[in-house]
């Protein structure tokens, strides 16, 4: 089942992430619903949140997990916030299926 955390948009998907920087390890902790009902993918990275290091680590980690080039992922919003929206280029059906598997859905 598709999650509101990832939505298809033509030739890409939008992924909502709640990032925990300095999280001890790089990991996907599943999909979680916020108090307002919006869902997001919980991701932690070991990088520190300074000078964009955590954002770069997030993009590199997700690219590796999805088997994509890092250039296929971009940050749309949330550069300095925990909640981020990413654009991931590729076949939306395939990307959503892979993300659901990674999130344990």
Task: Show which residues each predicted segment covers.
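Contiguous, often N-terminal, cationic amphipathic patches that form binding interfaces
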Residues: 1-51, 56, 74-78, 85-105
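Short acidic capping loops at alpha-helix termini that bridge into adjacent secondary structure
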Residues: 70-72
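Generic structural marker for isolated residues within well-ordered, non-membrane alpha-helices
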Residues: 59
């Amino acid at each position: 089942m598709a999650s509101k955390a990832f939505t298809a948009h033509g030739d890409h998907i939008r992924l909502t992430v709640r990032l925990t920087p300095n999280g001890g390890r790089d990991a996907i902790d599943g999909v979680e619903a916020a108090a307002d009902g919006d869902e997001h993918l919980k991701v932690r990275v070991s990088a520190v949140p300074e000078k964009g290091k955590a954002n770069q680590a997030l993009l590199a980690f997700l690219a590796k997990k999805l088997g994509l080039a890092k250039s296929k992922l971009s940050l749309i919003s949330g550069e300095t916030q925990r909640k981020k929206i990413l654009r991931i280029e590729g076949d939306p059906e395939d990307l959503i299926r892979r993300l659901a598997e990674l999130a344990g859905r």
